[in-house]
Amino acid sequence: MIDWDDLRVFLALAKFASQRSAGKYLEIDQATVGRRIKALETALGSKLFDRTSDGLVLNGTGQILLRQAKQVEDQILEIEKSTSARDQTHQ
C-alpha cells in the first residue's frame, strides 16, 4: 500500500533532486527521506530514481509516478479546501 507521506517525500525529492534539500523543505531529516523513498520503491516494486554523479534523476517509472502523484496531491488539496469551506458554512 502506498502511504501519502511517502508520496509527499517523493514529490519533494523529485522537485529538489537532493535528499538534504527535500528534507529541509519538509522539515524532516535526510535519513527519513531515504527511508520513505525506499519504502515507496518497495511498495511499488521498482526504483524511482537513478543515482548519478549530479544527484538523483527520475527514471521512467519515477516520471510516471510524478505525474500521478501530482494529480493525487491536487485532489487531496481540493478535498481539504472543499471540506474546510463546508465546515465554515455550517458553523
Regions found by a protein language model. Give the residues of each.
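Helix-turn-helix DNA-binding elements, focusing on the entry/boundary residues of the two helices
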Residues: 18-19, 37, 51
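Residues within the DNA-recognition helix of helix-turn-helix
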Residues: 29, 36-39
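Alpha-helical residues within the helix-turn-helix
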Residues: 24-25, 42, 63
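Interdomain hinge and pocket-entrance segments immediately C-terminal to HTH DNA-binding domains
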Residues: 84-91
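The DNA-contacting recognition helix of HTH DNA-binding domains
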Residues: 4, 30-31
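Short helix-boundary/capping micro-motifs
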Residues: 12-27
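A short LG(V/I)-centered, amphipathic sequence patch enriched
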Residues: 41-58
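Short alpha-helical "packing" element that flanks the helix-turn-helix/winged-helix DNA-binding module
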Residues: 6-13, 65
